């Protein structure tokens, strides 16, 4: 079957931002103006198409990444709407991995906010080209120039305006396109009708200055056009667009546009910018893959290449069961065919292929390189697994996710709920890699862990609504960690003789701190003192032992272990014996390696009216917080601080109380830090 759209006409992009910047509203307008929906859904009344979970409709926030596709100007746009709340950054992370471009949405009143910084960092990690859309230009306090400054100062982003707003706040009624030097004046109707007119006389000088600045910045990306410009020749519209596009593709230059999605102003111009400047799958560099022998290969977005796809999200559909969202990087995948899950080494059947419009399904026969769709029928595939053909096994780079920082105990209310709860928790942890569940060996309680209080609140809510499981919930607990602060050499020797074959494992391991680098294992065995087949079990033995540290039973992190000596027995040595010997060495080292307890520290940003500034500062200090900075935004004060997660429990209630409901805050995990001794005693 031939392609409906040439691969160069594809745009795989995400919409990302801080909570409440207007991502979902912008997505809804994109669906409406591209003809995908015939009625605009609103977030505030629970009618948004992209927010389809009950919890999303109630809370007016986006929890999962809804995927949809639209057509605009002969291009097919795969659009992913991602959450802005810090507890759901995993959704942003896995979406960015499979997208080619992104639109970063800013609130015109607030500019760059904490979660903007987080998602921007994530996008930079994957070198995702971006356009910035300054939304809510009609809002009181909207300030386009402040947004530009905050992009350059807080994100160190090379951001340049390619549009200018005409008016602001209640008087926002148009946009100046600096590429074409035309003004779009809106008549206020719902369908974003606008007239193309001359630039208002009182803005002509500013527009010319901003255009000059834009051209000076963008000609750097094309030598030929730069020469033309330096020789005093006038640049055409196509010349400027070509330079902007080249700049965007470097993922180091970010054009800035503006509008107000709720009032339907600027969305069509944003769609034009997506088509004009964001990359197609063939514009981005080939991705790295690995053959079954471990050798590296570059995978190009080509239909006639070998099949290479990545599962980036699992969702449960009430009608068809498990949906596996995939991005195809190379080759063609047909419904009814078999694929190899290269990560797990198993064969799976593709029963059906569906393109998603929010939570509605559209059946398709095949999916080609560069496209995104959902697969029905993959029973064992999970997030991060690589899919390829059986004939040519290919592995893509795995996806890494943050460890949970908060836990709580849940118990079923009735015997009937017990079995249902186990199945439900298994499904939920399959969908969300940052959600973990396990049984505490000592108390026999079921523990659930996640990225924040809201994350776990949503999980418990889903247990009740989707899976009809009633549970009692314990108080939240912080997920502490343990680590070494000094070097230590230790020996682990495990010998067991009890008739017949014995057990023998003997190791010498040097342990040392490995700040913020996780667990690192180094094999320095020479001369065959320990046979090669026992090296992996030694590493596995250490990893198992580190799951429950010697100090308080919390997982150990940031430790480097160097295996440098040992011995073996021809008959009695076994994998199990070396696993035990490794754990004995770790236990021995903990006596002299300065074992300490670490607690999670959160980066907190509190916004309060000026009259509550002193109260807010005092409250943060009382929570063992350290003030990092403050700034004034309009008539509010913004306080930036680092506060231990343990001290943040109940903060929302307290803040609401002393600010009469006028204060708000956001927080994100920052790092682990040595906990005070008083905490250890507790």
Curated annotation (Swiss-Prot):
GTP binds at residues 17-24, 81-85, 135-138. One of its GO terms (cellular component) is cytoplasm. InterPro entries: EFG_II (IPR041095), EFG_III (IPR009022), EFG_III/V (IPR035647), EFG_IV (IPR047872), EFG_V (IPR035649), EFG_V-like (IPR000640), EFTu-like_2 (IPR004161), G_TR_CS (IPR031157). Keywords: Cytoplasm, Elongation factor, GTP-binding, Nucleotide-binding, Protein biosynthesis. Residues 8-282 form the tr-type G domain. Belongs to the TRAFAC class translation factor GTPase superfamily. Classic translation factor GTPase family. EF-G/EF-2 subfamily. The gene is fusA. GO terms for molecular function: GTP binding; GTPase activity; translation elongation factor activity. This is Elongation factor G. PANTHER family: RIBOSOME-RELEASING FACTOR 2, MITOCHONDRIAL (PTHR43261:SF1), TRANSLATION ELONGATION FACTOR G-RELATED (PTHR43261). Its main location: cytoplasm. Pfam families: EFG_C (PF00679), EFG_III (PF14492), EFG_IV (PF03764), GTP_EFTU (PF00009), GTP_EFTU_D2 (PF03144). The lineage of its organism: Bacteria, Bacillati, Mycoplasmatota, Mycoplasmoidales, Mycoplasmoidaceae.
């Amino acid at each position: 079957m031939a392609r409906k759209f040439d691969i160069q006409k594809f745009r795989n992009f995400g919409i990302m931002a801080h909570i409440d910047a207007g991502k979902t509203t912008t997505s809804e307008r994109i669906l409406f103006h591209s003809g995908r929906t015939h009625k605009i859904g609103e977030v505030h009344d629970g009618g948004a198409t992209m927010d389809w979970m009950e919890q999303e409709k109630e809370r007016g926030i986006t929890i999962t990444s809804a995927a949809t596709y639209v057509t605009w100007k002969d291009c097919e746009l795969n659009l992913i709407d991602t959450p802005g709340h810090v507890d759901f950054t995993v959704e942003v992370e896995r979406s960015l991995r499979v997208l080619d471009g992104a639109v970063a949405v800013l609130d015109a009143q607030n500019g760059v906010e904490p979660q903007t910084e987080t998602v921007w960092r994530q996008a930079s990690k994957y070198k995702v080209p971006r356009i910035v859309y300054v939304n809510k230009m009609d809002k009181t306090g909207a300030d386009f120039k402040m947004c530009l400054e905050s992009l350059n100062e807080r994100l160190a982003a090379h951001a340049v305006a390619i549009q200018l707003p005409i008016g602001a706040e209640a008087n926002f009624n148009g946009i100046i396109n600096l590429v074409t030097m035309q003004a779009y004046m809106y008549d206020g109707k719902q369908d974003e009708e606008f007239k193309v007119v001359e630039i208002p006389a009182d803005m002509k000088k500013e527009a010319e200055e901003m255009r000059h600045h834009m051209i000076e910045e963008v000609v750097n990306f094309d030598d030929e056009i730069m020469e033309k410009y330096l020789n005093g020749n006038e640049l055409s519209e196509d010349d400027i667009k070509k330079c902007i596009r080249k700049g965007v593709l470097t993922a180091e230059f970010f054009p800035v546009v503006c509008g107000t999605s709720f009032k339907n102003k600027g969305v069509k111009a944003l769609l034009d910018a997506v088509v004009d400047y964001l990359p197609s799958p063939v514009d981005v560099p080939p991705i790295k893959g690995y053959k079954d022998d471990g050798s590296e290969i570059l995978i190009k977005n080509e239909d006639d290449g070998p099949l290479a796809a990545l599962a980036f999200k699992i969702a449960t559909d009430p009608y068809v069961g498990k949906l596996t969202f995939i991005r195809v990087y190379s080759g063609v995948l047909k419904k009814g065919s078999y694929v190899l899950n290269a990560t797990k080494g198993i064969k799976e059947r593709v029963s059906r292929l569906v393109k998603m419009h929010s939570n509605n399904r559209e059946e398709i026969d095949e999916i080609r390189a560069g496209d995104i769709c959902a697969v029905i029928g993959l029973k064992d595939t999970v997030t991060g697994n690589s899919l390829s053909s059986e004939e040519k096994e290919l592995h893509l780079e795995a996806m890494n996710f943050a460890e949970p920082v908060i836990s709580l105990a849940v118990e079923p209310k009735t015997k009937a709920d017990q079995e249902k709860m186990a199945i439900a928790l298994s499904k939920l942890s399959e969908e969300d890699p940052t959600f973990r569940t396990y049984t505490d060996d000592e108390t026999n309680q079921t523990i659930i862990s996640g990225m924040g209080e809201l994350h776990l609140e949503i999980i418990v809510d889903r247990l009740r609504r989707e899976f009809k499981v009633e549970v009692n919930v314990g108080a939240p607990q912080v997920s502490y960690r343990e680590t070494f602060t000094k070097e230590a050499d230790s020996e682990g020797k495990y010998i067991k003789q009890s008739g017949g074959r014995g057990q023998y494992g003997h190791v010498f391991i040097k342990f040392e701190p490995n700040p913020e680098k996780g667990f690192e294992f180094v094999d320095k065995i020479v001369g065959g003192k320990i046979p090669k087949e026992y090296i992996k079990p030694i590493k596995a033995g250490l990893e198992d032992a580190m799951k429950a540290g010697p100090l308080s039973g919390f997982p150990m992190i940031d430790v480097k272990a160097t295996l440098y000596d040992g011995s073996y027995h021809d008959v009695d040595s076994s994998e199990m014996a070396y696993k035990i010997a490794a754990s004995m060495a770790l236990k021995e080292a903990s006596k002299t390696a300065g074992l300490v307890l670490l607690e999670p520290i959160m980066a907190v940003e509190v916004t309060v009216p000026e009259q509550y500034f002193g109260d807010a500062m005092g409250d943060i200090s009382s929570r063992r917080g350290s003030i990092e900075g403050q700034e004034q935004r309009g008539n509010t004060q913004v306080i930036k601080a680092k506060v231990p997660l343990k001290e943040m429990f109940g903060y929302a209630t307290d803040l609401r109380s002393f600010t009469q409901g006028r204060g708000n805050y956001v927080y994100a995990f920052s790092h682990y830090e040595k906990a005070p001794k008083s905490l250890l005693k507790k």
